Amino acid sequence: MPSAGVERHDGARVISIVGPTASGKTGLGIAIARRLADRGERAEIVNADAYQMYRGMDIGTAKASDEERAAVRHHLLDVIEPSETMSVARFQQMARETIADLKSRGIRPILVGGSGLYARAAIDDISFPGTDPQIREHLEERERTEGATALFRELAVKDPQAAEHMDPRNPRRIIRALEVIEVTGKPYSATLPRYRYVIPSVQLGLDLDRADLDKRIDVRTRQMFDGGFVDEVARLRSHLGPTAARALGYQQVIDHLDGLVDLDDTMADIAQKTKRLARKQMGWFGRDPRIHWLSALNPALVDNAMAVIDHADAGDYDAIDMHAQEYVQHHLGDIRRPSGAGPV
């Protein structure tokens, strides 16, 4: 039984599958949906990868195949043009509307994606304060004339908690903090992400050792090029907006098409940058103490995932999840995970 004062969320949780690129999140999501279907429960996948939302960016983003989409319905794939701008705030609204719609129809949502902030934005207590160009321009001018130290002193008065954990030599963060205070009328520290579900959820993380993950990335990179990635980029390059163009691999292939880099070096560069991205993703997800880490190579992976889901549905993790915020330390963007937490 949950202890007194702990909120109990009865019923099926939203399932969120996270982990580094090439770890097998899509496959696990489909396997879980099928296993739930065997038990008489409908489930559908909600994409939480920023770049898979763009139409036509299929190969370079490792989007679910037609066969995979036929097996389990996917949402928030191919919803915007590459020329459009996608923001995490816009995604949050779309994802929460999709989740609410699915739940209202008795369908369990399974979030799948490698974009850490996007995955959290869908289910966590995260707000995204707007910007004000005039306020920002004024603060930037003050930084040029008065210096970052003066702005930092002002921040220390308006939001001591924010100033305590902020580098006084980082004017960009100081300016953003003062801008948020001016725009919202609230302390900047009050807008920071919190490890608290606003939608009852359970997070499954896929874990691999570095050598196995690197091998998967090398194989996937080769498969991308064998599958027509160069042709995909050639077709899309004139339509890529500033957000879509940041997707890893696309600019590298554009450089190849422009004759700046040969094909072998392009593939090697993409593989190396993907491995670097995977390390960053593991660092990001590793800070969240609520994630249940599962070995991606364990033959019993799906069974283990279902066991975690069943425990979550029964409320067995509620007490831990409710106190997750106490297990981490905020450094205004550098959120550290306690030692000792490892894969399940």
From Swiss-Prot:
Residues engaged in binding ATP: G19, P20, T21, A22, S23, G24, K25, T26
Catalysed reaction, written as an equation: adenosine(37) in tRNA + dimethylallyl diphosphate = N(6)-dimethylallyladenosine(37) in tRNA + diphosphate
PANTHER family: TRNA DIMETHYLALLYLTRANSFERASE
Alphabetized Gene3D superfamilies for the sequence: 1.10.20.140, P-loop containing nucleotide triphosphate hydrolases (3.40.50.300)
Subunit structure: Monomer.
GO BP, sorted A to Z: tRNA modification
Coiled coil regions in record: none
InterPro entries cross-referenced by the UniProt entry: Dimethylallyltransferase (IPR039657), IPT (IPR018022), P-loop_NTPase (IPR027417)
Record keywords: ATP-binding, Magnesium, Nucleotide-binding, Transferase, tRNA processing
Binding-site positions, substrate: T21, A22, S23, G24, K25, T26
Enzyme class of the recorded protein, top EC level: transferase
Pfam families linked to this entry: IPPT
Reported cofactor(s): Mg(2+)
Name of the protein described by the UniProt record: tRNA dimethylallyltransferase
Described purpose of this protein according to its UniProt entry: Catalyzes the transfer of a dimethylallyl group onto the adenine at position 37 in tRNAs that read codons beginning with uridine, leading to the formation of N6-(dimethylallyl)adenosine (i(6)A).
